Amino acid sequence: KYRNQSNMDFFSIDYIDIAKKLFRVLKPGGFFFSFSSPRLYHRMACAIEDAGFDIRDGFIWLYTQNQPKAMSLNHFIKKMPISEQEQIKLGESLSGWKTPQVKSCFEPIAMAQKPVQSTFLNNMLENNVALVNTNIKQGVANNMFPSNVITSESISSVIDRAFLTNKPNKQEKGENNIHKTVKPLSICKYLIALTTQQNSVVLDPFIGSGTTAVACKTLNRNYVGIELNAKYAQIARNRVADQQCAITADFADRQQVQPRLL
């Protein structure tokens, strides 16, 4: 489980192929944000680099609402070929000791960039992308210089002052949203506003329940979303339809169109 070859193959084979397709369609200087688990971030970042991108920075999405996954050893001790008394004694001696999984309270986000043509300035003038918008602010008072730490929940006055974005709620996620890992709208908006201009095109090849599309609509960006799961694709369509902007969503699902990266 902890050294699952399929996970390793995904990043060394499949994810490189995905990143190469994104590299092909991005303009020079275009940005690519990719979320990961802390344990596999290094393999994801290497795959992105191997596809031709430059890793510009790494973001931390900080949160506290998560369940510990460490497992107790009691189940394994009971299966040992020793007496019940020895099992009890061993369990007591290892009380509190669990499998090596601490509570995960952050999600790393790779910030990659397709290499620019000539200089950053010339690339910005030519392609309208390459720089970051430091007019975007963070924190409770919305007055802090943008950083690579983001949180959408109140943690402490010091952290909130510097890094807090708006906390997602049920209305934001949409009715009947069954997606298990809905990204906070505020975090998607932050990353999009930081690196794109109005009327830019944002591509999300794994759009899930549509948070990226909703963020683009509220920020006056165009978007392309791709999703294999038909149920998630419909949730995304519904969320987009609830917005007041007249931008059409085009989500591909397995039953209707063979998904592809443009």
Descriptions of predicted regions:
Residues 1-23, 31-34, 39-262:
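Class I S-adenosyl-L-methionine
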